[in-house]
Amino acid sequence: MAKTMPKKDVVVIGFGWTGAIISKELTEAGLNVLALERGPMQDTDPDGVYPQTMDELTFNSRKKLFVDVSKETVTIRHTSADTALPNRQLGAFLPGNGVGGAGLHWSGVHFRVDPMELRMRSHYEERYGKKFIPEGMTIQDFGVTYDELEPHFDFAEKVFGTSGTAYTVKGEKVGAGKGGNPFAPDRSSDFPLPAQMNSVSAMLYGKAAESVGYHPYNMPSANTSGPYTNPYGAQMGPCNFCGFCSGYACYMYSKASPNVNILPALRLDPRFELRTLCQVTRINLAADGKTATGVTYIDASGNEVIQPADIVAVCSFQFNNVRLMLLSGIGKPYDPESNTGTVGKNFAFQNMATIKVFFGKDQHHTNNFIGAGGNGIAVDDFNADNFDHGPAGFVGGSPFWVNQAGAKPIAGTPTAPGTPNWGSGWKKGVAEAYTHNVSMDAHGAHQSYRANYLSLDPTYKDAYGNPLLRMTFDWQPNDIRMNLFMQDKMSAIAKAMGGQAISISGKKEGSHFDTNSYQTTHLNGGAIMGTDPGTSAVNRYLQ
């Protein structure tokens, strides 16, 4: 029989960035907040201390900080006509687990949204006409504007200790010719810290980008360029470019995370409680089916526990938020055949391409073992709608950047085209390329489509007997057209760098989604916000 705990004002499901932020906001409002985290307690000390945290085999290859896919995963198929199978080996994306969630192992790249992308359908219809949006593409406006969100972006950067170079502040140009982004929207204040130093790779890239007419700028980075104390009193140390960011906890307290930037303040508040190893299985509803009354979870001993609360904040990873809504009977499940329902609708990912430039050993020493997760130089000339999409014939844009995050000895061993895949020739190629290459990425936007959606799997279940989430997803023609376009535009920078060889990794005509090729962990949609309950799962306040 399930044990019922004393009622709380608020129960928060998941303690990553969203859970930490909402917990801090609501405790400051005077509410008693309980956060439930499915994974273990994690903190810089003892879990991320030097030198243990700089262990590529444990954290990257064996994925210590990520979700255990033997217990909980998603099933994947390309189309509704296919049979989905469980994803038992992480590859295309890396959901986090434990206190901090994916916010503990992220890199620290910290952009703001482009104002246009918050009203994307309206913008494209106004500029290019309704027929420009392909049939089956289901993009819609968010129901909020950049101006409404700007004060919150500003405060978040102060909490994160973000390093960067503003271009305009309150309409005044302050970063022209100094590394600011001429395409960036206006800001109410500058970044809390100046931009980090740039790597040799980034400087070579920036010079080449400028030579072909693009507009390079310093990437905003949630890796500190100097000592910093945030508004909550959390202290951060300056980044030392150790190269162990993405997939790791930062032993220098330099990378923003819920663990470093918010949890220290929450621990001092008696109104806050954090329980770990608590797997939430249901959001409990009142008899009206519309009011949340709390949650049911499985504790570390395997006992079922009911936690009543006046407010339930669903703050777990994107996949799990959608799954919990479906398991709990919240909202109407999306049906792609009739294009009705909202929960599971508009699932989207990211559309990546990578180009590597290989130099001769007497050209440039790029020292790729040096790095910071969010640091680098980017161009936005082909991001958002900063260019004419009409002749290009697709929806979406992409920034290009060089973000030298630190090449590790197991995975960070690229070789130039033509190098043997094994043996002495491969070893020679690795040695020649390791500190003589530059890698650049197009982090392309990915649109939502009627054919791509999330639902409950009818066959496979998790360790607790609940249906797994099923991901129906594949690249669409618009994605491939955009990716090929971005490869071409980014190649201009690569060629201008004057290397001896170039390799391109991106989509081709007929490409399908591949679970082995890492894209990012930027998974979106499924419980989308908006102003129309007929097309959105939650309102503009995420209720």
Label the predicted regions:
Residues 8-35:
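N-terminal Rossmann-like FAD-binding beta1-loop-alpha1 element of flavoenzymes
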Residues 25-26, 30-34, 40-46, 113-117, ...:
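A generic secondary-structure signal for well-formed alpha-helical elements
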Residues 59-61, 67-76, 85-92, 121-125, ...:
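Conserved redox-cofactor binding core of oxidoreductases
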